[in-house]
Regions:
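N-terminal presequence-like segments and adjacent domain-start helices
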Residues: 1-37, 48-51, 68, 75, ...
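Short amphipathic beta-strand starts and helix->beta connectors
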Residues: 40-46
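Short, aliphatic-rich beta-strand segments
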Residues: 55-62
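Compact nucleic-acid interaction/catalytic patches
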Residues: 80
């Protein structure tokens, strides 16, 4: 009896996701997940909106103190986001508003 062609769940999910990787909504979801992962839920609650276009992440923040702190650590934050998204997206810049 021939053995069935079994594929791992990661391979199946990769094939399902592949056509959507270049869609703006999918890329924004990846950025939002990375933002939450790098900064935590407290900073996420103070983030009004995230936008992503042409490699640039724009974060609209509700907190002036958080904006000031993140601007001081902007390069480190950008590197952490790049590391988090290393296999999925290329980030070129981070704008904090």
């Amino acid at each position: 009896m021939p053995r069935p062609n079994l594929e791992g769940i990661d391979g199946i999910l990769s094939r399902l996701i592949a056509p959507h990787r270049h869609k703006p909504a999918f890329q924004l979801a990846l950025v939002q997940r990375a933002w939450r992962s790098v900064l935590g839920s407290a900073a996420e609650l103070k983030t009004r909106k995230l936008a992503f276009a042409d490699g640039v992440v724009t974060a609209y923040l509700n907190s002036d103190s958080l904006r000031h702190e993140l601007r001081a650590q902007r390069e480190r934050l950008l590197e952490a986001l790049r590391e988090e998204l290393r296999d999925e997206l290329e980030l070129t810049d981070l704008i904090l508003k």
